[in-house]
Amino acid sequence: RQIRFLSDFHYPQNTKLNAFDLSVIMNNALNNCMENVSGDDPYISISSFRKNSIFMITIKNSFGGQLNFGDSDLPETTKSGREHGMGLNNIRRVARMYMGDISLEQGNEEVILSIMMQVE
């Protein structure tokens, strides 16, 4: 299957952001995107920017389904396995290490994951 991949990602230089921590975020987010991307023109988009001490990452993917949030602000997984469904929790854990958090939105047949961290 062909998936368009768009990137405007810039790693913030001279900050306290650990490359391993960023890899946890990117690996989990991209795995989620690859598992769930759908639509007639499937795409994954990654962008980032830094403003003062704040580093923002936005990851979008086309998605024609419906997320089920249940009692949480994170969607419930429908897949089985002890480790399945831990990706967003791992992303949130890392963001909170940097006094940040994540948000997840769905609309216009896409899912948008936003990650905010303080990197100074």
What are these regions (language model features)?
Residues 6-25, 82:
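Conserved short strand/loop->alpha-helix "switch" segment adjacent to the catalytic nucleotide/phosphoryl-transfer site
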Residues 24-32:
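Conserved polar catalytic motif of the HATPase_c/GHKL fold
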Residues 33-41:
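A short, flexible helix-to-loop-to-beta junction within the catalytic ATP-binding CA
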Residues 43-53:
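Short beta-strand/loop element within the Bergerat-fold HATPase_c
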Residues 54, 65, 107-114:
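Glycine-rich nucleotide-binding loop
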Residues 55-85:
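Glycine-rich/acidic phosphate-handling loop/turn and adjacent ATP-lid/helix
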Residues 99-109:
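Glycine-rich ATP-binding loops of the HATPase_c
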